[in-house]
């Protein structure tokens, strides 16, 4: 499985990329989304006000995310799903998807190291982390998916590049 990541400059391009993954049969549990808290507020404001704490695994979150999915963007629904997202106010980040579970496992004391370790463990080269960190700081949205096949990986890479993604890594 190849990890495909891309940094999207705006909500529309990120939503289109997220939708392309779900249209290919990937679930929100397989799609990672990382953005700043300011970006979440800017693009998803009142629709994504449900905040989670590190390690909070409330089961009802999945139902909330699914119920909200029809009334707002797919990314906002993923953020709202308590069981699959983290809001890290001290770092100003919002993380949704399997990466959130990996970071939650680090516990509150290891969150900062957990994020860096999880991103590296996720397969993002260390030299690319700086590009993503700056892009997220500047309001971008990072999306990543572990492609199930080489064909899926090529499709993600092509679709995301055509959809204004920066720093697409396969």
Which sequence ranges carry the predicted segments?
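Cytosol/matrix-facing juxtamembrane amphipathic
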Residues: 2-55, 106-170
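Small-residue-rich hydrophobic membrane-insertion segments
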Residues: 53-131
């Amino acid at each position: 499985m190849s990890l495909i990541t891309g940094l999207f400059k705006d909500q529309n391009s990120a939503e289109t990329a997220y939708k392309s993954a779900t249209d290919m049969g990937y679930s929100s549990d397989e799609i990672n989304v990382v953005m700043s808290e300011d970006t979440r507020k800017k693009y998803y404001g009142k629709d994504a006000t449900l905040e989670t704490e590190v390690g909070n695994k409330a089961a009802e979150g999945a139902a909330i995310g699914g119920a909200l999915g029809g009334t707002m963007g797919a990314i906002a629904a993923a953020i709202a799903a308590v069981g699959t997202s983290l809001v890290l106010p001290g770092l100003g980040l919002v993380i949704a998807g399997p990466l959130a579970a990996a970071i939650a496992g680090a516990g509150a004391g290891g969150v900062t190291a957990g994020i860096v370790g999880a991103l590296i463990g996720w397969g993002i080269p260390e030299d690319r982390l700086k590009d993503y960190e700056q892009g997220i700081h500047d309001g971008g949205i990072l999306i990543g998916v572990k492609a199930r096949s080489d064909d899926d990986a090529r499709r993600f890479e092509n679709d995301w590049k055509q959809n204004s993604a920066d720093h697409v890594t396969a």
